């Protein structure tokens, strides 16, 4: 399944070796749910992209990735558009949504693990690994932040892969290292450490059931059908998305 997904970036699976996979999603704290009267919308992304929800949550802190290449595909898919942003008008429409919620956003950050774990923010967009790490840290210190990592329709799926540069001098060692990371014992330990899903199926069998049964780490078949693969945006789409983001 991962190899099929990876073909969007590596046709024929000729070069890339997957070692981790995960989802881009959102998390909310107990305080955030309290401000919403304990009721979450059917579409969890509404929490992030509709002012009727962000207005209620701004007092406890909303955080977005400071990464347009991560945020725009999620928002485009939410709007029913091509996540690649191939149509400039689609990107502009997405930017208007971002403008509408911008006054309610407290922080733009590449990583929000600590802020979310402390309860400094109550709604965050991020990858499932970071969000689940924040949840684990919060539970470890028993600070009662009450983080829930949501699994709404339209999550973005990504794959981290190994590639060997064409001009690499130590190709044999590179292959040895890749094989080492794919060893079930090693891959399982790494997956547990970062709360990502190892690409190796035998590794998954060595991970705690609590993690394997967490859909924001190991999405189920329906999640996969309802989501999309994070795309490689064209140079023009990237440039426009960055320009719109900076505005």
Give short role names for the model-derived ranges.
Residues 27-32, 76-80, 158-170, 189:
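A bilobed periplasmic-binding-protein/Venus flytrap-type ligand-binding module shared by bacterial periplasmic
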Residues 114, 221-247:
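Conserved C-terminal helix/tail region of periplasmic/extracytoplasmic solute-binding proteins
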């Amino acid at each position: 399944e991962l190899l099929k997904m990876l073909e969007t970036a590596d046709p024929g699976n000729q070069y890339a070796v997957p070692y981790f996979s995960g989802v881009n999603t959102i998390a909310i704290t107990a305080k955030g749910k309290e401000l919403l009267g304990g009721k979450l919308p059917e579409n969890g992304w509404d929490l992030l992209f509709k002012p009727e929800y962000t207005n209620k949550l701004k007092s406890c802190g909303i955080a977005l990735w400071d990464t347009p290449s991560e945020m725009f595909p999620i928002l485009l898919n939410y709007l029913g558009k091509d996540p690649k942003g191939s149509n400039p008008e689609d990107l502009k429409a997405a930017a208007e949504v971002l403008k509408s919620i911008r006054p309610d956003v407290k922080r733009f950050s590449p990583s929000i693990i600590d802020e979310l774990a402390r309860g400094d923010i109550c709604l965050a967009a991020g990858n499932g690994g970071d969000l689940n790490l924040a949840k684990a840290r919060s539970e470890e210190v028993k600070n009662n932040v009450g983080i829930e990592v949501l699994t709404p329709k339209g999550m973005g799926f990504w794959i981290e892969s190994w590639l060997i540069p064409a001009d690499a001098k130590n190709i044999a060692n590179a292959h040895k290292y890749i094989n080492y990371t794919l060893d079930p014992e090693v891959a399982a330990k790494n997956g547990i450490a970062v709360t990502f899903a190892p690409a190796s199926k035998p590794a998954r069998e060595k991970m705690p059931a609590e993690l394997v049964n967490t859909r924001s780490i190991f999405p189920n078949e329906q999640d996969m059908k309802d989501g999309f693969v994070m795309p490689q945006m064209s140079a023009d789409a990237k440039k426009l998305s960055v320009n719109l983001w900076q505005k």
